[in-house]
């Protein structure tokens, strides 16, 4: 028992000097430094670990079989408000790079819901906590590669941006998803079936690559006629290059491509360390919208 206790309470250290992303447990996240305002309250009104706890409470409310699967924290290049800050005065107490000395402003967590899980798919509730605010989304997750699917605009919510809600309304939206879990899960799996049945010719494959490029260019254009039409692009330019190469390789290996293959090539990029945390959820949803619609017609 003493050995087990020693292991559980052993100090944990982060190394964001060499790692852009660190993985941790919920207990470790709770131990990180709490960022408060001048009144001693959480800067975002709620701590990152409390957001995850609220999500798990909703899972419990509906007797769902869940586990907090992965928690990531990421650094970013924002010098004014970096994703990770190390406090030297706290290091003096706990040691160099101690967990307790870290302020984590960019956290991404996945909560796996195992009800009606298959050999191919589970369902994941994802949470992003960062400098802009809080995001949540739900959808199927491909077990073999951990590729997250967000297959409808109704499956994501945030407390900032164009369609922002309050933090409590965000939790209310999640409650709505989980209260109708089986029905919404079946709707998403039907969308996957449609993607799998949608054959993609070589011409269509190149058309999708061109469309994704056009959406990116339009979004970033200084011409409002174009930028006003694209709120979120599915892939940025560097991602389009990686996606295109991966898709071309897949086309060499498979006789027939489907829209599901195209989607999975892109969702491989929507992971911490590959996509900026605040962009992971909206880009994923934007891509599904393109593939499930008839944008090429």
Language-model-detected regions and their locations in the chain:
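A short acidic/basic microdomain associated with nuclease active sites
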Residues: 60-103
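Feature for intrinsically disordered/low-complexity regulatory segments and propeptides
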Residues: 1-53, 62-63, 67, 72-76, ...
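Intrinsically disordered, low-complexity regions enriched in serine/threonine
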Residues: 1-14, 88-297
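Compact, well-ordered interaction domains used in eukaryotic information-processing assemblies
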Residues: 56-57
């Amino acid at each position: 028992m003493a050995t087990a206790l020693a292991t559980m309470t052993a100090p944990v250290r982060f190394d964001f000097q060499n790692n852009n992303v660190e993985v941790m447990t919920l207990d470790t996240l709770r131990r990180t430094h709490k960022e408060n305002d001048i009144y001693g309250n959480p800067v975002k009104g709620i701590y990152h670990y409390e957001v995850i706890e609220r999500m798990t409470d909703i899972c419990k409310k509906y007797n769902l079989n869940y586990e907090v699967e992965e928690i990531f924290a990421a650094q970013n290049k924002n010098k004014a408000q970096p994703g990770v800050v190390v406090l030297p005065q706290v290091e003096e107490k706990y040691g160099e790079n101690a967990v307790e000395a870290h302020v984590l402003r960019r956290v991404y967590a996945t909560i796996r819901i195992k009800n009606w899980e298959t050999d191919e798919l589970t369902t994941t509730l994802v949470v992003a906590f960062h400098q802009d605010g809080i995001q949540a989304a739900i959808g199927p997750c491909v077990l073999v590669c951990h590729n997250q699917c967000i297959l409808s605009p109704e499956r994501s919510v945030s407390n900032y941006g164009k369609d922002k809600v309050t933090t409590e309304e965000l939790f209310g939206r999640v409650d709505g998803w989980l209260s109708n879990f089986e029905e919404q899960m079946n709707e998403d799996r039907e969308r996957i079936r449609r993607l799998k049945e949608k054959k993609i010719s070589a011409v269509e494959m190149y058309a999708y690559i061109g469309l994704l490029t056009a959406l990116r260019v339009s979004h970033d254009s200084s011409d409002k006629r174009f930028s006003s039409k694209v709120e979120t692009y599915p892939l940025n330019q560097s991602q389009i290059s990686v996606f295109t190469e991966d898709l071309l390789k897949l086309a060499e290996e498979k006789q027939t491509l489907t829209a599901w293959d195209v989607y999975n090539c892109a969702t491989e990029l929507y992971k911490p360390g590959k996509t900026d945390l605040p962009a992971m959820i909206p880009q994923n949803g934007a891509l599904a919208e393109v593939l499930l619609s008839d944008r090429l017609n």
